[in-house]
Regions:
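Short alpha-helical segments and helix-capping/turn motifs at coil-helix boundaries
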Residues: 44-47, 58-67, 131-137, 161-173, ...
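Cofactor-binding active-site loop characterized by glycine-rich and histidine/acidic residues
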Residues: 51-173, 355-356, 369-370
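N-terminal amphipathic, basic-rich helices that act as targeting or association modules
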Residues: 2-91, 249-271, 279, 283-289
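Amphipathic, well-packed alpha-helical segments that form the structural scaffold of globular domains
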Residues: 34-42, 133, 347, 370-373
Length: 678
């Protein structure tokens, strides 16, 4: 769509280049701008993919915040930053949406490099209130109390414990922070009612229960109106809880409470925000919204409200986008999915063993646990955005005789490492951790790449680590992990997997994917096993033969793999995780130890992986290629290593005989050995 077409379809939005432009609009124009923002976001996300439902629900909230507060002088923070698309639209980044979440384009989250209006690069939940506390304390200390700090919190963030730690300090320190609570009915109310200590104790007390039950029975005994009266009492009780409990909870923490108000009425929101802006301490404005507001398909999606939409450019035209909706979720990929393989596998083990329980942290759909929840609701636990609690709870279940399987995104494992290490690992609790979205994930950028799971997992002494090379391997690995009776980690990527590469692996054994002699061994870890095969084929065309092994289990390593690798002249490991401290480093150390034990000079070990830096968003294949982790890059690394080995072997010969010892096209000469260089 060209610039002129943008102006025709979005006449008001095309006039907004900064938040200052918003303050020139009247109430009617604000309503029309909200409608235009929704149409624009649906159109843009349909073209590129992205988070839809959360942004559609926060349109009026974001408009009102920018009309009342003066960003970037005032600080606007977005918890779970995928609800910041409207914020980006209103701060001069409309044209960037043509490349939303594309390599070199607009990030799907706040990004400090994009705009001074983005203070934090926030994409993990429950952190904004802590940022807000710190910024507000800094303004107070630096003599700038006139600068306001606003945190938009919602979309599940208040199920995370860190948010409550921040609330406690905000109230105690009387920090001047305005909390805008985006309550879309999918996260907030159940959490607060359970954490409102005084009323929870009251409702659970025997006297309260007996009195309430007697009143209900007495009303229901009244002829003609009894049943209706009893139902009315229950409804009234529920309504009163919703009205009273948030006020009691926040006020008890020393935080002023306003609301609830309509989160889709800009005028009402502006009035409330103006009052909140004048308050000298912490204040929460409770706004009721609807996730996916104004777009039929999102509102009709009861499970996720079109939370995350894949690109469907054929449907993204202005004539087909309306507030009632025209863009639907496109056809599912026919490629094999690791997540779907796990989903089936956990159902299978659950059917065979009633002790199996499945745990997730607010991700039942994306991790593939919805079928398990539907079949075994009594054995399914969603703890909300509380990964630390999930891990320690799983340890407790394992200690008491259950077989917990924790399905979690790889990137979120860093949020609960202490619990993995001390509560699961130290106790040897047989918890199986299934890390989805491992490796380079793509569009969501540095906060969502799963690059640390191997590093973290391998630092826990007794944790078994599995890396399936293809989806068909996931089921067998889950069975093997449950049979170990020790902690275990299975990590697998978001991207579709290859067709079967070889005969299925068994137990803790490796798989030989290609026989190419004993001199060169390529170890492709997880999804990079296929890449190693492709690299070997490229090398074979040049007369360089290499064997390819899929380790399958990184720890404990198969003794057969160690024996084969220790006897080679060159070993190359490739992984789509962090290079330093990852699987390659662990394997290299094990090869070194095995070589020393056998009193042989070990092979040259070349490790390939992701360097220690924050990897931006982009297509996974493109990112991996730039890191040298595609077949071409891996083959190039093999050639370079062979040249090094040839040089190291030739130098002594040249000194002794004045002649060089070369390498033929087929590989290294027998007897040539390289130094162990890792």
């Amino acid at each position: 769509m060209d610039e002129h077409a943008h102006d025709v379809v979005y006449p008001l939005l095309s006039m907004i280049t900064s938040p200052a432009d918003l303050r020139q609009l009247d109430a009617g124009q604000c309503a029309e701008l909200a409608a235009e923002c929704r149409r624009f976001v649906v159109d843009a996300v349909s073209r590129t993919g992205g988070h839809l439902g959360s942004n559609l629900g926060a349109v009026e909230l974001t408009i009102a915040m920018h009309r009342v507060f003066d960003s970037p002088r005032d600080v606007l923070l977005f918890d779970t930053g995928h609800q910041a698309y409207i914020h980006k639209l209103l701060t001069g980044r409309r044209e960037g949406f043509a490349q939303l979440r594309q390599e070199g384009g607009l990030s799907g989250y706040p990004n400090r490099a994009e705009s001074p209006h983005d203070w934090i690069e926030n994409s993990h939940a429950s952190t904004a209130l802590s940022y807000a506390h710190g910024v507000a304390k800094a303004f107070e200390r630096l003599g700038e109390p006139h600068r306001r700090v606003v945190a938009l919190v919602g979309d599940g963030a208040l199920t995370g414990g860190m948010a409550y730690e921040a609330l406690n300090n905000l109230g105690h320190d009387e920090a001047r922070v305005c909390i805008v609570l985006n309550d879309n009915g999918r996260s907030y109310a159940p959490t607060v009612s359970k954490l409102s200590e005084s009323l929870t104790q009251l409702r659970l007390s025997p006297s309260y229960g007996m009195i309430r039950a007697k009143v209900v029975r007495a009303l229901e005994d009244i002829p003609g109106v009894g049943q209706l009266a009893g139902q009315s009492l229950r409804s009234l009780t529920s309504a009163l809880r919703e009205l009273v409990e948030p006020h009691v909870f926040f006020e008890a923490l020393g935080i002023r409470y306003l609301g609830p108000i309509d989160g889709h009425d800009v005028a009402v929101l502006e009035d409330a925000l103006a009052k909140a802006a004048r308050y000298p301490g912490p204040i929460v404005l409770h706004a009721l919204t609807r996730k996916g507001k104004g777009y039929g398909p999102a509102e009709a999606d009861e499970v996720q409200c079109l939370h995350d939409l894949k690109a469907q450019p054929a449907l993204a035209t202005p004539s087909r986008v309306s507030d009632r909706g025209a863009v639907l979720v496109g056809p599912r990929s026919t490629d094999a999915s690791y997540t779907e393989a796990f989903s089936k596998a956990v159902l299978d083990v659950g059917a065979r063993d009633e002790r199996v329980v499945a745990i997730t942290a607010a991700m039942p759909g994306p991790t593939g646990l919805l079928p398990f929840e539907a079949r075994y609701p009594e054995r399914f636990i969603d703890v909300g955005i509380a990964e630390s609690h999930a891990m320690t709870s799983a340890a407790g279940m394992a200690m008491a005789g259950l077989r917990p399987v924790v399905a979690i995104y790889s990137t979120f494992l860093s949020r609960c490492f202490d619990q993995q290490n001390l509560d699961v690992g130290l106790h040897g609790a047989p918890v199986v951790i299934c890390a989805d979205r491992a490796g380079v994930t793509g569009d969501d950028g540095p906060s969502h790449h799963g690059l640390l799971d191997m590093v973290l997992g391998l630092s826990i002494p007794n944790l078994a680590v599995f890396a399936p090379a293809e989806p068909s391997e996931v089921g067998g690995m889950l069975v093997s992990a449950l049979e170990l009776r020790t902690p275990a980690l299975i990590r697998y990527p978001k991207t579709p997997g290859p067709a079967r590469l070889a005969a299925p692996g068994t137990g803790l054994h490796c798989r030989i994917l290609r026989e190419g002699g004993d001199e060169i061994v390529l170890l492709g870890i997880g999804k990079l096993a296929k890449t190693a095969l492709e690299a070997a084929e490229l090398l074979a065309r040049e007369g360089i033969e290499a064997s390819v092994i899929d380790p399958r289990v990184i720890r404990p390593l198969d003794p057969a793999l160690l024996g084969r690798a220790s006897g080679a002249q060159l070993v190359v490991t490739a992984e789509d995780g962090l290079l330093h401290g990852g699987a390659g480093a662990y394997i290299a150390a094990e090869i070194d130890a095995a070589s020393a034990a056998a009193s042989v000079r070990g092979p040259l070990v070349v490790r390939l992986g992701v360097p220690t830096r924050y990897v931006p968003h982009g297509k996974p294949d493109v990112i991996l290629a730039r890191l040298g982790l595609d077949a071409t890059g891996m083959a190039s690394s093999v050639r370079g290593a062979l040249a090094r080995l040839q040089g190291s072997a030739a130098e002594p010969a040249m000194r002794a005989a004045g002649a060089g010892a070369g390498r033929g096209a087929g590989g290294l000469k027998n007897g040539q050995r390289g130094r162990v260089a890792r």
